[in-house]
Amino acid sequence: MRIVITIGGSIIISEFSHEMFRAYADILNSLRDEHDLFVVVGGGRPARDYIGVARELGASEARCDDIGIDVTRLNARLLITALGDSAYPGVPENFREALEVAATGRIVVMGGTEPAHSTDAVGAILAETVEADLMINLTSVDGFYDRDPAKYPDARFYPEITASEMLEHLRGSDVRAGTYEFFDHTALHMIRRSGIRTMIVNGNDPENLLRALDGEIGTTVIPE
């Protein structure tokens, strides 16, 4: 199966530590013999910190996006290092390049691509480009909620939801660089257009990637 996996930066680099990179590398390496794997890595707190400084310096939102993209690519390089020879050694900067290097049979790891595209959007566009069978979005919560469960204990969890319903919930949310929450609008439009089977899963435990593949946890997004 061809799978695109997006790992939020808040998951993989919540602290400047090698441990999460190593743990995800071990899980991904255990899957590579059975699946074609593409991984998109987010920027996390380092990206937000750099973007915050850039805004204080008067940078435009487009420039802030560029800075965030640079950080995601650094995170991608760290994961590639953890994966060793099983990963393609370079970080593709666009979707065509990602598709081309997939011919090597190695795990393809990339960061951002262009301004105004979150990690979710990059993952969804990549999934369409490589004709993925599944996209798994690894985030800091158990799946999709109607509002932030960290702020609202009574937030409703959805084990299953359509992309159209998610768009209704997310209408009006913040789309500035470094502020994406829950799931990105562009990603949802891509999922709906391309019929990409998608799961949203808590990535704080790397083992949850295996549980998601077994259908045990997370939110399934129906592409309609």
From Swiss-Prot:
Pfam families from the entry? AA_kinase
Enumerate the UniProt keywords alphabetically: ATP-binding, Cytoplasm, Kinase, Nucleotide-binding, Pyrimidine biosynthesis, Transferase
Do the record's keywords include Nucleotide-binding? yes
A GO MF term: ATP binding
| Notes on activation and inhibition | Inhibited by UTP.
Q: In which pathway does it act?
A: Pyrimidine metabolism; CTP biosynthesis via de novo pathway; UDP from UMP (UMPK route): step 1/1
According to the UniProt record, one GO cellular component term is: cytoplasm
**Binding-site positions, ATP:** G9, S10, G44, R48, T139, Y145, D148
Q: What class of enzyme is it?
A: transferase
Cite the PANTHER family for this sequence.
URIDYLATE KINASE, URIDYLATE KINASE PUMPKIN, CHLOROPLASTIC
Family (UniProt)? Belongs to the UMP kinase family.
Q: What does this protein do?
A: Catalyzes the reversible phosphorylation of UMP to UDP.
Name-wise, this protein is Uridylate kinase
Origin species: Methanothermobacter thermautotrophicus (strain ATCC 29096 / DSM 1053 / JCM 10044 / NBRC 100330 / Delta H)
